[in-house]
């Protein structure tokens, strides 16, 4: 394998984390450090767990970390919905972020399936 940096799902998840940092740098997030921190942590957790999983010695270990990444992605989606509902950003931003989260989730599902099938 060529390493985690070659995984498209890692690349997309990292790009999403960078986008989240940019979005949460301004506006209402300036005064809500709690939610901003939670959103950022969840966003960074996704590519971090993909990377850690890919570098593990066994597929079983890798899959465990990929599931953790999926969990962090669901956490991120929930927090983004809350941020939108309390007026931190508009629906267009939410839809864009949700679409990317769904793509990453599908890619993680495929990666889990592929790595689970390898013995």
What residue spans do the PLM features occupy?
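Short, C-terminally biased terminal segments at protein or domain edges
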Residues: 1-119
């Amino acid at each position: 394998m060529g390493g985690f940096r070659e995984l498209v799902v890692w690349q997309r998840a990292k790009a999403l984390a960078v986008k989240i940092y940019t979005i949460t740098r301004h506006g209402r997030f300036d005064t809500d450090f709690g939610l901003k921190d939670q959103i950022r942590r969840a966003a960074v957790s996704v590519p971090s767990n993909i990377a850690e999983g890919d570098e593990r010695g066994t597929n079983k270990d890798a899959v465990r970390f990929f599931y953790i990444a999926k969990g962090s992605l669901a956490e991120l989606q929930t927090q983004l919905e809350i941020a939108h509902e309390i007026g931190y950003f508009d629906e267009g931003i939410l839809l864009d972020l949700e679409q990317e989260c769904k793509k990453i989730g599908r890619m993680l599902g495929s990666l889990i399936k592929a790595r689970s099938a390898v013995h």
